[in-house]
Amino acid sequence: MKINKAEFVTSAVAPDHYPVHELPEVALAGRSNVGKSSFINKICQRKALARTSSKPGKTQTLNFFNINDEIMFVDVPGYGYAKVSKTEREKWGVMMEQYLTSQEALRGVVLLVDIRHDPTGDDVTMYNFLKHYEIPVIVVATKLDKIKKSQRQKHEAAVKRKLQFDPSDRFVAFSAETAEGKDEAWKAIYALITEGE
């Protein structure tokens, strides 16, 4: 996948701020610090398209990125960050739910989880939310380079078991360090935006 264009378009907190365009949208969701920004930067072959931060909970808006004039990535706020106030978390929740359930351009969601650990309660809640609303989902298990190759199957099985993963969904093991899983991620994303056309 050759990336000729990858640019930040705008940030939004409400539907009247969403950019007007005709591209299919793919949202990226996951726990704070799961590696969403690193995932976006790596698959788009850019060093700082999405800002990475050592401070969890940094993304507080819906951030729209135009990729090749073909896809609009939408980075949604990371969830599960304890140091953000309850009011702030609820505000994010409403913003995300509003976007995920009402945006007609949305073709699906890339849900990022950390392959090293069992998915959190928040991860399971998000996966169930997407299944409930019949929003197509790709589960991307990040930080693949942090576990031994001999342990991969065990970790993948644990993630799937905890999520009660639906085999009709796509699962990609991914490393932003080595780019392993990058091609598989693009294949899954393209399948998402071309299904039902």
UniProtKB/Swiss-Prot annotation:
Cofactor: Mg(2+)
Molecular functions (GO terms): GTP binding; metal ion binding
SUPFAM superfamilies: P-loop containing nucleoside triphosphate hydrolases
Gene Ontology cellular component terms for the protein in this record: cytosol
Gene3D superfamilies: P-loop containing nucleotide triphosphate hydrolases (3.40.50.300)
One Pfam match: MMR_HSR1
Keyword Transit peptide: no
Family recorded in the similarity comment: Belongs to the TRAFAC class TrmE-Era-EngA-EngB-Septin-like GTPase superfamily. EngB GTPase family.
Name listed for the protein in its UniProt record: Probable GTP-binding protein EngB
